[in-house]
Amino acid sequence: PSSSHTVGPMKAARLFLKNAVEEQHFDAASTVMVELFGSLALTGVGHGTDKAILMGLEGETPEEVDPESVDLRFHQICRDEKINLLGNRMVSFSTANNLIFHKDEQLPHHSNGMRFSLMGHPQKTLFSQIFYSVGGGFVLEEKEMENSSCENSIRVRYPFSSASELLQHCENQSMSIADLVLTNEKTWHHEDKIQEGINSIWYVMKGC
């Protein structure tokens, strides 16, 4: 699995519903729509993005989900056409109609974009948000992407675009690859959040 295609989407799905609860839209929901764009749409099924998102919608986190139960639960959702949002609200959900892969479209800020929409009756959009899975299991809401300078415009301490440049930095600084990459990651995230993301990735990969 890929952290950008599994851990991130699972977190985004759960966060979306948590936000819907805070905005008091959750209790009126009759279903939820999920749209995937760019790389998530093109390669998501192979990486298990669809399964990760459905688990996130049911309230699971990468740290606590039982990997051995995922396939069974996924097939139950597909068969019954129902999903238990956050584990306490059963709504209709068809993977054919409610999980859309926009393979020819990409959202503006990142190739791993997702749009979640909570729907009421009759097909009224109650609450909608866009999220981006930006790598390492981290997710950002659209407003966070818009309000920040974004990764590409922030210069890391040790920039590199090839393996040879990476190794040259390591030699010059007497650093391991892991330490150098960690230093760069601190440009965007606190170390505790980085370690949390790494642990999440390892847990999911170990269970597969």
Language-model-derived ranges and their functions:
Residues 1-13:
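Conserved phosphate/anionic-ligand binding catalytic regions in large, soluble enzymes, centered on
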Residues 18-208:
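Feature of Fe-S/electron-transfer and energy-metabolism proteins
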